[in-house]
Amino acid sequence: MDKKDFKDEKLLYNVRETAAVLGVNVNMVYELIKRKLLPALKLGSLKVRKTVLIEFTEKYEGMDLSDLDNIKEI
């Protein structure tokens, strides 16, 4: 990957962007991070790596996450 490609590639998403990608509200993203279901890092504000979002959606595909105390298959 050359420098031009790297600059055009978004690697980190803030909480608002993460919520938009996942189609949930920001409170759900904060809760997923708090419960360590969605790994994040803090660089000024909380950020989620693009690869983490992909892994998260693959890991929880077919699961109902609407109640984080009772995650189950759909």
What do the predicted segments below correspond to?
Residues 46-47, 55:
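Short, surface-exposed beta-strand-loop junctions and turns on beta-sheet-rich folds
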Residues 41, 52-53:
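Short secondary-structure transition/capping segments
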Residues 3-28:
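Polyanion-binding surface elements
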Residues 14, 43, 67-70:
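Generic structural "secondary-structure junction" signal
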Residues 53-74:
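A short, Lys/Arg-enriched interface patch at domain edges and termini
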Residues 21-46:
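Major-groove DNA-recognition helix of helix-turn-helix-type DNA-binding domains
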Residues 1-6, 68, 72:
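Compositionally biased, disordered extreme N-termini, encompassing classical targeting presequences
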